[in-house]
Amino acid sequence: MKIGVFSVLFYDKNFEDMLDYVAESGLDMIEVGTGGNPGDKFCKLDELLENEDKRQAFMKSITDRGLQISGFSCHNNPISPDPIEAKEADETLRKTIRLANLLDVPVVNTFSGIAGSDDTAKKPNWPVTPWPTAYSEIYDYQWNEKLIPYWQDLA
């Protein structure tokens, strides 16, 4: 079994120092944030997508230390009722998937997202109980009008 760590824990370090620390700690894998809530300190999506030399240097820095990428992470909300947040989250996720494909990274971790209560909502709403019935209606709206269509399109 290979053991790894989420690189976001080491945002106090630069990329090379983070990799050295992880390798010297005896770990095998790193999960790298690409944007959204984990941030993108160690992985600038646009730079890596646009430049093969930068992609090769990025991977060389990792593999030269005997490390592998277990996955990319872009935890955000692609179905947010805030259209700007939703657009940014969707773009980050799609770019992360493209980069994972280019670098043979096997996993992209993300959040499924949380919609608002209805089409007029300004903030996400997370109903956790089926009663009163308004919560069931919110739940149904979120799943059938937001989550399922978004993820079917992405897939």
Predicted stretch roles:
Residues 7-13:
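Short polar catalytic/cofactor-binding loops
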Residues 3-7, 28-32, 69-74, 108-110:
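Hydrophobic faces of well-ordered beta-strands that scaffold small-molecule active sites
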Residues 10, 49-50, 88, 146:
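Residues that cap or flank secondary-structure elements
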Residues 1-3, 67, 90:
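Transmembrane beta-strand segments of Gram-negative outer membrane beta-barrel proteins
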Residues 38-45, 73-81:
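Glycine-/proline-rich flexible loop or hinge segments
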Residues 17, 56, 61-64, 71, ...:
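Active-site acidic/histidine proton-transfer and metal-coordination neighborhood
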Residues 16-38, 103-107:
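Catalytic domains of carbohydrate-active enzymes, especially glycoside hydrolases
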Residues 33-59, 112-119:
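Glycine-rich, proline-tolerant flexible connector loops at the mouths of alpha/beta enzymes
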